[in-house]
């Protein structure tokens, strides 16, 4: 088998290969040099054999269906040549040699004293991984070695690896329903004598018949990469189980053997945290170990980001109360010049500043003590998830208050000018801290009294914090909350006690770190350049890391003395995570200055982030411009408390109760009671949603934490009642019946999920983001999608950050979640008519944002839209006429999906540098899938179908492109295109069988009999979905369904393009004369200005043509308008001049005329004053007779050419048209000799030197000028014979010419 076949995923992934593969790489080159004719003959023979088998073996129906599928794919490959998903390479990838990785792994493991079991497990991951990047540099190899060691040596990750060893593990489920894949995996496993349960299931799906072993070779090659991936996954699982069993069980996975900070220090600044997190994310994704590993990596990175923001705020506030130190000034002003070549060979995990303890000041020790106290409280309080952002900030403020009040060394403190820091009533500075952030003083005081005091007592009782010197044995530790106590104040009364407390807290943290830690969180105040700051002097930095500059800049600790600059330095990364990208689905109401409807409405003055400031009158909260993640979070919390301030208890307000009573029906339960009972039953299982851990041995701490969880739950319920009241008021403005909403169960579940989602977002609990709450309330995303628009419309005071968060959720639902297996969207789309959604260009209409709640949560209603253009469609969707009901929400849903598709398509086409012409074709294919082939979306994402559509359209347009190029520009995760659902559902299988029946007419009955058997197999496949990569999906499913329509779209688009550029001659006006325009024949872009009844070129004079819809935007001057003319008045921008009526007029379009003629116009205008030519004298009778003879000879040609021009739209008639036009003008001059002689005046000289390809220049009409004075002076002038029609008089050979009556040959220069 070829190592690099056309559809091998090595074109997408760089695979780690052993050194022995270098000798076998020459084999693919030799095989690729075979003539294409031999391959085509081989494929044609296979097709003929398969057709014979279909005709002869009518009994084996399942086998015939499989052969038919192979025939279709093979025929498409032969006919289209490149319509298979071949990710072709123009060169061979540079592959990473395993020997290099092995040597780096051994060196790193020996330096860190890693045990052999961890090394074996890490090598197992490196052997079986697949890389997305093609980077093979030393830097990248060190990064993946570090990732493998950390995953296998960290307790949290290694415990997940141990769970893979359990028999119930479902992280690797082999594809049981693909026969080809089953045979491939069985061969691999049999060669290794691995008899697992999954292998037995695969053997059951295969048979030993020779016909199955001799299936089509090309299809096997297309599936070869998928088989290798599946085999590699099973080999990885077997290798992991083998390593774990040899290590002696799970005892090896209950302790940390590799520490992240220690690991990164080993590489001496070559790997920073920013680079490590990016590589770790990609490493886990490509190993395909499961969502648990991805979630663990996400929590690790999120924890670091949260601590980074908190430390920056802590350091900023601390040095407003204490004098800045030299180390702080050095860190903020000279960090870019820091020497990274310091001795880092010490493998201990102590911070770098321990080597310089003699240079540390008391302020430095106090700064470190405060951060270590916070780490102690944080590790005790948040044991499960990442730190709670708001709770952590309150703890930091309490610690600053604790240090400032209990520091008796007055020289260390810095009192801000004109500010009263210490509150005389309480003796603390909490009021000052609450105003400086700002935050809620009540919440801050509550945390200080109930939470921080408990942990400060624990520190003192365990002798971690010492009250005074060791020589003093006074044991006064009981009343530590009394700030006036001498014992408390003696904690930081001299330098020796400060150093002892620092050492004690440092040792306490080290014990925790070696037992549970992931990142050494002391690096923030130690400012370890080997880990925390990007090394600018590293010459081995690979260009691939430049893509993560925004992350690297964020991890740089660029602090400034100026607080505003300090806040703005670290916004690049974290602020982008707080502000999700705008979605093209739901229109944003923040773009307008007014808001209509209920829920507040009116004009709202918003700041630059869209947070309303009108309703936040208490303290003018909305006027605070958020600049940092902390200030953004506090602003959201303030908005939330103002929003629910009327709901003191988790019960409906009086206003809501009165509204619900009005909806009560006789002899039924009160709506208020039903509401309270429903909320209570749905939220019973939400007590643990805000779990923040705690100390098991202290009942007081558990009670305090339970209060925090209950308080946040109550806030979510209060917000639910607040949003419900707004929605009901909004509905009452348009309809008096609100029972539809009150009795809809999904409506209440969606509203509760929305309320809990807001609470989780306000407090930055990312582990509880969507789709956590819809799973808790057992709600489908399609139902939850209905409420997002209503909340964004009704709640006018919703901050922009929350609106963007819900827009991002909406986009996720439209991309992935709405197309799940149990979604009702497929049957809903099938039962609705969408003919009037798309306009004549196939583009979706504007998204409707005026849907009422009852329209969203209701049954479909009859369509009241009488659109006269309903039946005019560009896209042939073949929608049946049976549906008679429509739901406005479903129509709006289709518009949103189409808008998302066109936005993604345009972005991707632009990134690939392709023409915008591809967008129309790709969009039509996607709309066809959305309306008629909706089942292709099932269990798949929009990105998968969009990539396949782009690839297919590029191929039919003869554009060489690869899947790898499209995937690289789409920036999707590896999981999206590696784990695509391959199984055919019921309808797809029926359609495939019908296609096979059309191709094999002799076996129609036999194939139809087996449809039921195939449907039963598909129902079994839904339980264990078959997954493969995007190339297998493209060849096996996408092409079989969409191939005919792709060619139809391409052919229609080509016809439209040809029709657009080949304008019919009957729509063009005749050559007309105008006194105010330069002479020109047959303009390229013409706006009809003449009644077609008088058009001699129009064969049908009885029915005048309508005006063209594409009116040029350029001005048109001097158009002659008679009573028979009709033109859009907006086109003309200058008044019409009076002139002698003639039989025709002419329009000259300036903006759309050739630039050469515009240059000639300018030349003539410049010569008009100084270069005036004398008009010719009256023509002699001989010349008149001469002209008459010429005209009589060409009369027949005139009639014939006129007919030709009216019937044929051909460019070859241009010369005939010129002759006709010239002869017509000659006829006019000969028939009206006396009149023409008086009208002939001065002529403008035009220098026509156009190419022979533009015949219009050879016979352009002259411009008449009614000047009587000049006419009288022209009688005495002579002119050469104007009737000379010799070729020598052609304008191509003369620089300038003019004549009163010239023939088609040209004109001569006038003489005085």
UniProtKB/Swiss-Prot annotation:
Residues 10-67, 219-231, 337-359, 536-595, 1185-1234, 1251-1275, 1286-1305 have a biased composition (Low complexity). The keyword Oxidoreductase does not apply. It is found in: Nucleus. It comes from the Eukaryota. Pfam families: DUF3452, RB_A, RB_B. Disruption phenotype: In shaking culture, leads to a higher density, a faster dying after reaching stationary density, and, after starvation, a lower spore viability. However, shows abnormal slow proliferation on bacterial lawns. Also leads to hypersensitivity to the stalk morphogen DIF. Belongs to the retinoblastoma protein (RB) family. This is Retinoblastoma-like protein A. It comes from Dictyostelium discoideum (Social amoeba).
């Amino acid at each position: 088998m070829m190592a690099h076949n056309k559809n091998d995923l090595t074109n997408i992934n760089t695979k780690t290969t052993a050194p022995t593969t270098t000798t076998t790489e020459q084999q693919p080159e030799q095989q690729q040099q075979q003539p294409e004719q031999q391959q085509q003959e081989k494929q044609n023979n296979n097709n003929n054999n398969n057709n014979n088998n279909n005709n002869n073996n009518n009994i084996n129906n399942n086998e015939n269906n499989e052969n038919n599928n192979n025939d279709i794919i093979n025929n498409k490959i032969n006919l289209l040549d490149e319509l298979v998903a071949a990710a072709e390479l123009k060169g061979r990838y540079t592959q990473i040699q395993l020997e290099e990785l092995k040597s780096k792994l051994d060196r790193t493991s020996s330096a860190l004293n890693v045990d052999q079991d961890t090394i074996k497990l890490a090598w197992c991951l490196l052997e079986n991984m697949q890389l997305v990047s093609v980077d093979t540099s030393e830097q990248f190899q060190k990064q993946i070695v570090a990732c493998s060691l950390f995953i296998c040596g960290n307790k949290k990750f290694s415990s997940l690896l141990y769970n893979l060893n359990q028999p119930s593990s479902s992280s690797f489920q082999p594809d049981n329903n693909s026969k080809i894949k089953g045979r491939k995996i069985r061969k691999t496993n049999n060669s290794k004598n691995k008899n697992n349960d999954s292998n037995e299931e695969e053997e059951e799906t295969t048979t030993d018949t020779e016909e199955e072993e001799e299936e089509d070779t090309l299809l096997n090659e297309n599936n070869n990469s998928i088989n290798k991936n599946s085999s590699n996954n099973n080999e990885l699982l077997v290798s992991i189980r083998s390593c774990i069993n040899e290590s002696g069980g799970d005892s090896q996975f209950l302790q940390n053997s590799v520490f992240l900070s220690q690991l990164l220090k080993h590489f001496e600044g070559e790997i920073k945290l920013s680079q490590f997190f990016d590589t770790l994310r990609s490493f886990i994704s490509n190993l395909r170990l499961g969502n648990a590993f991805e979630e663990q990596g996400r929590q690790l990175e999120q924890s670091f980001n949260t601590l980074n923001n908190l430390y920056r705020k802590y350091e900023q506030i601390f040095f407003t109360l204490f004098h800045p130190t030299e180390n702080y000034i050095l860190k903020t002003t000279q960090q870019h010049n820091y020497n990274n070549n310091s001795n880092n060979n010490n493998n201990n995990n102590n911070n770098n500043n321990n080597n310089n303890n003699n240079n540390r000041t008391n302020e430095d020790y106090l700064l470190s003590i405060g951060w270590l106290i916070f780490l102690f409280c944080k590790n005790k309080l948040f044991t499960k998830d990442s730190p709670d952002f708001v709770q952590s900030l309150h703890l930091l403020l309490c610690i600053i208050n604790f240090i400032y009040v209990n520091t008796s060394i007055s020289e260390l403190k810095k009192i801000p000018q004109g500010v009263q820091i210490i509150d005389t009533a309480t003796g603390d500075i909490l009021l000052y801290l609450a105003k400086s952030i700002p935050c809620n003083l009540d919440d801050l005081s509550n945390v200080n009294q109930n939470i921080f005091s408990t942990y400060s007592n624990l520190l003192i009782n365990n002798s971690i914090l010492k009250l005074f010197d060791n020589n003093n044995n006074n044991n006064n530790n009981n009343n530590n909350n009394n700030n006036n106590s001498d014992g408390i104040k003696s904690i930081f009364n001299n330098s020796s006690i400060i150093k002892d407390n620092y050492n004690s807290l440092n040792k306490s943290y080290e014990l925790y770190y070696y037992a549970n830690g992931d990142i050494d969180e002391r690096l923030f105040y130690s400012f370890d350049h080997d880990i925390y700051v990007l090394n600018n002097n590293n010459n081995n930095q690979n260009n691939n890391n430049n893509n993560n500059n925004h992350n690297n800049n964020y991890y740089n600790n660029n602090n400034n003395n100026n607080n505003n600059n300090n806040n703005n330095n670290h916004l690049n990364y974290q602020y982008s995570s707080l502000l999700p990208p705008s979605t093209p689905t739901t229109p944003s109401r923040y773009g307008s200055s007014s808001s209509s409807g209920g829920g507040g409405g009116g004009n709202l003055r918003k700041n630059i982030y869209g947070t309303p400031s009108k309703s936040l009158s208490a303290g003018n909260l909305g006027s605070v411009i958020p600049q940092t993640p902390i200030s953004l979070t506090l602003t959201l919390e303030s908005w939330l408390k103002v929003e629910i301030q009327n709901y003191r208890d988790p019960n409906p307000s009086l206003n809501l109760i009165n509204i619900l009573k009005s909806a009560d029906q006789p002899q039924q339960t009160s709506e208020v009671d039903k509401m309270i009972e429903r909320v209570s039953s749905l939220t019973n299982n939400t007590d643990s949603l805000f779990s923040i851990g705690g100390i098991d041995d202290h009942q007081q701490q558990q009670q305090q934490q339970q209060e925090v969880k209950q308080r946040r739950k109550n806030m979510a319920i209060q917000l639910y009642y607040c949003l419900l009241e707004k929605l009901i008021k909004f509905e009452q403005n348009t309809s008096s019946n609100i029972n539809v909403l009150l009795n809809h169960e999904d409506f209440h579940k969606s509203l509760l999920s929305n309320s809990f989602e807001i609470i989780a977002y306000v407090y930055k609990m990312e582990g509880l983001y969507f789709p956590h709450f819809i799973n808790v309330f057992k709600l489908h995303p399609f139902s939850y999608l209905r409420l997002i628009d209503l909340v964004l419309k009704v709640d006018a005071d919703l901050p922009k950050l929350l609106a963007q968060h819900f827009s991002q959720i909406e986009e996720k639902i439209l991309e992935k979640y709405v197309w799940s297996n149990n979604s009702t969207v497929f049957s809903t789309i099938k039962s609705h008519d969408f003919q009037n959604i798309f306009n004549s260009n196939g583009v979706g209409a504007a998204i409707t944002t005026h849907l009422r709640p009852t329209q969203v949560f209701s049954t479909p209603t009859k369509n009241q839209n009488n659109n006269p253009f309903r039946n005019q469609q560009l896209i042939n969707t073949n929608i049946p006429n049976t549906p008679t009901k429509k739901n406005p929400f479903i129509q709006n849903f289709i518009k949103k999906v189409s808008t998302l598709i066109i936005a993604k398509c345009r972005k991707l086409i632009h990134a690939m540098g392709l023409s915008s012409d591809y967008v129309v074709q790709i969009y039509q294919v996607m709309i066809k899938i959305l309306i008629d082939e909706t089942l292709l979306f099932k269990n798949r994402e929009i990105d998968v179908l969009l990539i396949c559509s782009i690839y297919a359209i590029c191929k039919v347009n003869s554009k060489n492109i690869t899947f790898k190029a499209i995937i690289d520009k789409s920036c999707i995760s590896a999981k999206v295109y590696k784990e695509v659902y391959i199984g055919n559902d019921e309808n797809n299988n029926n359609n495939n069988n019908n296609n096979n029946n059309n191709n094999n007419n002799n076996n129609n009955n036999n194939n139809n009999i087996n449809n039921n058997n195939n449907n039963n197999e598909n129902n079994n496949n839904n339980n264990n979905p078959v997954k493969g990569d995007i190339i297998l999906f493209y060849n096996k499913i996408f092409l079989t369904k969409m191939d005919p329509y792709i060619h139809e779209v391409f052919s229609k688009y080509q016809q439209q393009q040809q029709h657009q550029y080949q304008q019919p001659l009957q729509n063009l006006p005749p050559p007309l004369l105008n006194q105010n325009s330069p002479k020109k024949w047959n303009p390229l872009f013409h706006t009809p200005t003449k009644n077609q009844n008088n058009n001699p070129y129009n064969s049908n004079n009885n029915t005048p043509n309508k005006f063209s819809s594409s009116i040029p935007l350029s001005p048109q001057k001097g158009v002659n308008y008679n009573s028979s003319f009709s033109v859009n008045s907006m086109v003309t921008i200058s008044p019409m001049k009076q002139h002698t009526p003639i039989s025709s007029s002419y329009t000259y379009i300036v903006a759309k005329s050739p630039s050469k003629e515009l240059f000639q116009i300018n030349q003539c205008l410049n010569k008009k004053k100084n270069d005036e030519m004398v008009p010719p004298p009256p023509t002699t009778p001989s010349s008149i007779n001469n002209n008459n003879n010429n005209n009589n000879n060409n009369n027949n040609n005139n009639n014939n050419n006129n007919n030709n021009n009216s019937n044929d739209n051909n460019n070859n008639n241009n010369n005939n048209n010129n002759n006709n036009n010239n002869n017509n003008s000659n006829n006019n001059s000969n028939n009206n000799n006396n009149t023409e002689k008086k009208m002939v005046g001065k002529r403008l000289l035009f220098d026509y030197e156009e190419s022979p390809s533009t015949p219009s220049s050879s016979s352009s009409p002259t411009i008449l000028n009614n000047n009587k004075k000049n006419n009288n002076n022209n009688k005495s002038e002579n002119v050469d014979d104007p009737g000379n029609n010799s070729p020598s008089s052609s304008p191509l050979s003369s620089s300038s010419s003019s004549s009163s009556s010239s023939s088609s040959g040209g004109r001569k220069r006038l003489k005085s």
